[in-house]
Design a protein with these regions (language model features):
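Glycine-rich, basic loop-to-helix element that forms the pyrophosphate-binding segment
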Residues: 62-78, 99, 150, 154-158
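A conserved acidic beta->alpha catalytic loop
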Residues: 22, 37-46, 65, 87-93
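Catalytic donor/gating beta->alpha subdomain of glycosyltransferases that bind UDP-sugars
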Residues: 174-236
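Acidic donor-binding/catalytic loop of UDP-sugar-dependent glycosyltransferases
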Residues: 43, 90-103, 186
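Short, acidic, metal-binding catalytic loop of nucleotide-sugar glycosyltransferases
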Residues: 21-30
Length: 329
């Protein structure tokens, strides 16, 4: 068996149903599925039963330990040569494993891979806008997986695969949440394994369904970036300050308009131009005025919430250690 698909889930039976349905429709069939119920009160046991005949599926219930350690739980019980992890809110296109197989066969085996995410046609306008914001060069600076990726590529565990040798060497996740996937990806590469970005191995990632949920998630992501520094100090770069600067100057310019602060009008004009750029680019991709408007809002929410989360955690880190934590190399 080539692949073991490991899916941790916490109180989301509806998402698991949709994900498993897409896995029944993939063209490559040499894989098993391990669903890890991570201490849920609203379990998906009844959903798993529906797929017993159409998928090689195993279901485990355990105490809540978080998604990172739940993936380790699955890896230890996996039978495949490669371990694939998806988030429960993903939909898998039919060609996914074919795209990965092509790269594995071309390189006579690979250590680790990840792929991008896209918006499915069934997504709501808000979901499409959030997907745009989370994948756009203008809002991520090319730090996430796409064709315009800048710098070292670190697969994210909404769409990631590793060989069983990688797991044997690294022992998997050492933190269970708050940047656990990036920390794992960094450690994989430090162990001299290679990570491949496979653009055709994309998934449809629902992410959050409201801007309030999106704000909370990105605030957490900002905190997670500082948490990663605790394990890998050199991985915190100047580029990670950009959302913080975005948030600080946005607040300054907004308050400054009320109290006539210096340069507040000029700064606000720059933010307006940035918003127009986001709308134009989102409209080019989605061909929807509503999605374009939402995309501009999502971009501002993403950068501001990430920056504020980063700021909160950096204060905590400075209390723990008096050193400077920004690597300028």
């Amino acid at each position: 068996m080539r692949y073991s698909v490991v899916i941790p889930v916490y109180n989301r039976p509806g998402e698991i149903d949709e994900l498993l349905k897409t896995l029944t429709e993939v063209t490559y069939k040499s894989f098993e599925v391990l669903v890890i119920e991570d201490g849920s009160t609203n379990t998906c046991a009844h959903i798993i039963d529906r797929y017993a005949d159409s998928l090689d599926i195993r279901y485990f219930q355990k105490e809540n330990t978080g998604q990172g350690f739940s993936r380790n739980f699955g890896f230890k019980r996996a039978k495949g040569d490669y371990y694939v992890v998806f988030d429960s809110d993903c939909l898998i296109p039919a060609h996914y494993f074919d795209a990965v197989n092509d790269v594995i066969d071309q390189h006579n085996g690979i250590d680790c891979w990840g792929g991008p995410d896209r918006a499915h046609e069934s997504f709501t306008p808000v979901q499409k806008a959030i997907n745009y914001s989370m994948t756009s060069l203008f809002t991520t600076g090319g730090t996430r997986g796409n064709r315009h990726h800048i710098g070292s590529y670190h697969p994210r565990s909404f769409n990631m695969g590793i060989s069983k040798e990688v797991f044997a060497e690294t022992r998997g996740y050492i933190i269970t949440r708050m940047g656990e996937d990036i920390e794992f990806s960094i450690r994989i590469q430090k162990s001299r394994f290679n990570a491949h970005l496979i653009n055709d191995a994309f998934v449809y990632h629902k992410r959050r369904t409201s801007f309030k949920q999106f704000y909370k998630q990105l605030f957490f992501f900002g905190r997670a970036r500082v948490n990663i520094w605790r394990f890998h100090p050199k991985e915190l770069k100047v580029v990670h300050l950009f959302p913080l600067l975005f948030a600080v100057f946005l607040i300054y310019s907004a308050v400054g308009l009320l109290f006539n602060f210096p340069l507040s009008k000029e700064l606000m004009m720059l933010y307006l131009v940035f918003g127009v750029v986001l709308m134009a680019d989102a409209y080019r991709i989605e061909k929807s005025i509503l999605v374009a408007l939402y995309a501009a809002a999502a971009g501002f929410i993403q950068l501001t919430s990430y920056g504020l989360g980063f700021l909160r955690e950096i204060f905590r880190a400075n209390k723990e250690q008096g050193d400077s934590i920004i690597n300028t190399d």
